[in-house]
């Protein structure tokens, strides 16, 4: 696939997917560097979140549409490789949080809501943050987005309970 010229790939309808696959190694390295550059802030957010209460911290991975799949991938891995004595890792779609918060959120559980969002403008992503903020007594937010100008990043910029990572 990588040996075909762009016109051949376009004719096959494979030019975009091939380009995305080809850029993955570089993007993973970029993402690792973003993590390293923000490690102190991430560690501080996790320490603050753990200090919110006794017992395990509920870590909810959420997103809308394809961004929801990130949490579906992270949570099972972290349940296996992460510290499950300190953290309860759960993937929950934004639409589930918005439509039935009592089914997915516990008001008394200290929570870290990790939101994945490409644009940071999807109504359900923004609503999930607001619903969680109103419903959960002790909550912190980690926003991972591609868009510094998106509402998710902009609206949490001055929030001491939020950290936004731009990838």
Question: How should these model regions be labeled?
Answer:
Residues 53-167:
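Glycine-rich phosphate-binding loops that contact phosphosugars or nucleotide phosphates
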